[in-house]
């Protein structure tokens, strides 16, 4: 809440969010374009094959296996695949299977033209051609992964063809800040439909909205990420119609987030984006709830009525308590995974812009954590993965914070 969370919240002032959120939409879109694995850190078994790409239309998604991708490349600004022999492979509208046509196949070129028009209707950020290409590719894949009804799949494989609330929230945020608010609203509409009565979400859902019954407990960070995404998708509350439609979802989530803050000012222990059972509060959950409470308080300021005003004050106070506890409990150790340690955690990137106000101590912790988690030029999420392969979402989170 502004630059001094505790003080501002104590005085119930409106959160001053706009000044530090409208930054680097490229990095945000890249984070989300490749964040499909963020909520899918575990699978029931090792997948026998990873997809090299995806083809799709509004109704069907098809993975491109690596053994079929040799020498292939997507046409610029589209999901039409040019094979090594020059032929074009794509999924026509309404088709159930990919079609392979000649190099100038009119159907393929029409699909590519429509996708380029969709990109042009928004913004494709980036300072260089390579950055713009990465952002465009991410946005096109996000568009494909958002299924009819707004289900934003984590990936097009049997292991991850589900909706994780945090993945979907980041997807909605990326689509919103790049000018594709209709798609962002659809994603948030799906999340609204899968929200539980207590304001929480299942750890993941099927594309038809049914919860996945695999024994995973609810992950509390969803009650932070969804309000944050709703705030961005509604143009920070300026789209009053969308803000009004999402208000019941935001209200229930933020009420639960505020009620979850314990006497120590922190949320309870529980799984976060690592999807592991925890014995102590994690930085990832605390950062998500802090972003969500700030965003919800801002949205409440634009709502009519005494009840909304009371909630704004309550959520701002909860954000102030949480921010103070994060600084007091996590700060002395350099913002590690747990208050008592636990090693570096990429979630430190979620404490500063564009999720929260600038803080020199947080900025220093981000730089230190990056150095400790860097592997082969990228980043792993935390200590357990040191020596392993970098994670794109963790790496992109540091890029966003840079």
Kindly give the residue locations of the regions a language model identified.
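N-terminal Sec-pathway targeting helices
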Residues: 15-32
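Low-complexity, Ser/Thr/Pro/Gly-enriched N-terminal "stalk/linker" regions
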Residues: 24, 32-161, 185-186, 190, ...
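Well-ordered alpha-helical scaffold segments within catalytic/enzyme domains
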Residues: 114-128, 169-181, 225-241, 288-306, ...
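Active-site acid/base region of carbohydrate-active enzymes
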Residues: 125-137, 196-198, 228-284, 338-345
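Long, well-ordered core segments of solenoidal/helical folds
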Residues: 134-150, 180-202, 246-266, 316-334, ...
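Acidic/His metal-coordination segments adjacent to aromatic residues that form catalytic metal sites
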Residues: 150, 202-218, 263-281
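Aromatic-rich carbohydrate-recognition surfaces in CAZymes
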Residues: 161-261, 286
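Extended ligand-binding clefts on enzyme/binding-domain cores
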Residues: 217, 280-291, 301-396
């Amino acid at each position: 809440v502004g630059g001094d969370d505790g003080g501002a919240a104590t005085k119930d002032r409106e959160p001053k969010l706009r000044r530090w959120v409208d930054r680097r939409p490229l990095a945000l879109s890249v984070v989300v374009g490749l964040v499909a694995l963020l909520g899918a850190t575990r699978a029931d078994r090792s997948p026998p094959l990873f997809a090299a790409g995806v083809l799709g239309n509004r109704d069907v998604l098809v993975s491109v296996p690596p053994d079929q991708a040799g020498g292939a490349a997507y046409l610029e600004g589209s999901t039409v695949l040019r094979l090594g022999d020059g032929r074009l492979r794509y999924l026509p509208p309404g088709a159930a299977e990919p079609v392979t046509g000649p190099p100038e196949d009119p159907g393929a070129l029409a699909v590519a033209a429509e996708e380029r028009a969709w990109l042009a209707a928004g913004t494709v950020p980036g300072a260089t051609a390579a950055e713009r290409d990465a952002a465009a590719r991410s946005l096109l894949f996000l568009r494909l992964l958002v299924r009819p009804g707004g289900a934003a799949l984590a990936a097009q494989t049997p292991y991850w063809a589900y909706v994780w609330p945090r993945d979907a929230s980041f997807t909605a945020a990326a689509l919103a800040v790049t000018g594709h608010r209709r798609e962002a609203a659809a994603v948030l509409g799906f999340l609204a439909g899968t929200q539980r009565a207590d304001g929480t979400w299942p750890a993941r859902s099927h594309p038809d909205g049914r919860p996945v019954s695999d024994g995973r407990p609810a992950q509390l960070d969803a009650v932070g990420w969804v309000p944050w995404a709703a705030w961005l998708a509604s143009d920070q509350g300026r789209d009053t119609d969308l803000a009004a439609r999402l208000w019941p979802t935001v209200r229930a989530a933020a009420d639960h987030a505020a009620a979850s803050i314990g006497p120590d000012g922190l949320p309870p222990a529980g799984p976060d984006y690592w999807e592991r059972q925890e014995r102590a509060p994690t930085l990832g959950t605390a950062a998500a709830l802090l972003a969500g409470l700030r965003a919800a308080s801002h949205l409440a300021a634009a709502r009519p009525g005494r009840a909304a005003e009371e909630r704004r004050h309550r959520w701002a106070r909860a954000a102030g308590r949480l921010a103070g506890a994060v600084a007091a409990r996590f700060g002395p150790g350099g913002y590690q995974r747990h208050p008592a340690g636990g090693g570096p955690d990429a979630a430190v990137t979620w404490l500063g812009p564009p999720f929260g106000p600038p803080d020199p101590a947080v900025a220093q912790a981000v730089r230190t954590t990056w150095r400790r988690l860097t592997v082969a030029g990228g980043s792993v999420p935390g200590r357990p993965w040191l020596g392993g392969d970098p994670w794109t979402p963790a790496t992109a989170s540091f890029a966003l914070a840079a």
